[in-house]
Amino acid sequence: MAPEPEDDIMNEKNPRPLDEDDIALLKTYGLGPYSTSIKKVEKEIKEMAKKINDLCGIKESDTGLAPPSQWDLVSDKQMMQEEQPLQVARCTKIISPNTDDAKYVINVKQIAKFVVGLGDKVSPTDIEEGMRVGVDRNKYQIQIPLPPKIDPSVTMMTVEEKPDVTYNDVGGCKEQIEKMREVVELPMLHPEKFVKLGIDPPKGVLCYGPPGTGKTLLARAVANRTDACFIRVIGSELVQKYVGEGARMVRELFQMARSKKACIVFFDEVDAIGGARFDDGVGGDNEVQRTMLEIVNQLDGFDARGNIKVLMATNRPDTLDPALLRPGRLDRKVEFGLPDLEGRTQIFKIHTRTMNCERDIRFELLARLCPNSTGADIRSVCTEAGMYAIRARRKTVTEKDFLDAVNKVIKGYQKFSATPKYMVYN
């Protein structure tokens, strides 16, 4: 029997070295018809990039700075001395507007008034009477227009990060969501429908109902959905120590809102400042009433409101002033009532969506055991059921945990519920 070729190779003690022809043959493996041209172009690109970096003076460093040999500290210092900081002034009057010889009266605070001209970088159409401007310190020429001065506490009310709450997270409020979307989203997405009919879209919504029914939650969902600027104001923030401070904050708030393309202003717990006017003989609530009157004026006063939607939430609508509630200021009143059986079942499913629960839990049965309960009560039931599971050192929540939680929260905490008191007043 003849030995196999593989056995011959294994048995060779002195393998034959590769000659030049074999090496040349190995180098041709994996090469295509354009390999030589591609290598040539790649080499030219590397050389060109190296030449560009040498001309620009950029080293391969973390900072990307030019080498010290190319630094020109004298010219940099001269440039810094020429660009002096500007001084803030206010343009009080324009003399001979819309002409080449237009002059501007500016008032520099704590110094004097000056009649000045425009700098080289400013267009005459950019300057209006009453606006803040930046002027140089030598000739007091107007160099740049400045935005209006707004209190930082008002600027901080803008919601920068969108909340993570969507309409799917608001259970038992199907009708309320539709009404809210008609007021907020429809005029922004389809304004042509209102133009064709010749009507103005509704601009204000009052959300009222018992505590814990989802008024603020729905406002957070609106902020998540819309691309407009969302400003959140808590009623007690506008109650200030000094006379006129609250009204000034309201004016600056709506001034900032008008500067946006589209804006939604949400007043939470509006009964803190929107109470009905009365005379208690002491005058303690006069400042709060002035703040409320400023809101009334901004909502529908002499000046147009613009594309500003106003949402208000309260659980005491009976205490609000009638001037605040009239159509034109708040066009719609949306009541957030207690959820029905279907709504309570949906709320249970929403809150248990992220929980480790058994599969065969009867949420409809749990909803039947929670009559006249709000969404906040049901959330408390789910949290308490998780506490029962933690206490028993289990990793999943059973139906018995939910039943025990219902017995504890719904029945045990009944005396703390604010819903019956709300029903009495409203």
From Swiss-Prot:
Its main location: cytoplasm. GO terms for biological process: proteasome-mediated ubiquitin-dependent protein catabolic process. GO terms for cellular component: cytoplasm; nucleus; proteasome regulatory particle, base subcomplex. InterPro entries: 26S_Proteasome_ATPase (IPR050221), AAA+_ATPase (IPR003593), AAA_lid_3 (IPR041569), ATPase_AAA_core (IPR003959), ATPase_AAA_CS (IPR003960), NA-bd_OB-fold (IPR012340), P-loop_NTPase (IPR027417), PRS7-like_OB (IPR048723). ATP binds at G209, P210, P211, G212, T213, G214, K215, T216. Keywords: ATP-binding, Cytoplasm, Nucleotide-binding, Nucleus, Proteasome. It is found in: Cytoplasm; Nucleus. PROSITE patterns: AAA. GO terms for molecular function: ATP binding; ATP hydrolysis activity; proteasome-activating activity. CDD domains: RecA-like_PAN_like (cd19502). SUPFAM superfamilies: P-loop containing nucleoside triphosphate hydrolases. Signal peptide: none annotated. The 26S proteasome is involved in the ATP-dependent degradation of ubiquitinated proteins. The regulatory (or ATPase) complex confers ATP dependency and substrate specificity to the 26S complex. Belongs to the AAA ATPase family. This is 26S proteasome regulatory subunit 7A. It comes from Oryza sativa subsp. japonica (Rice).
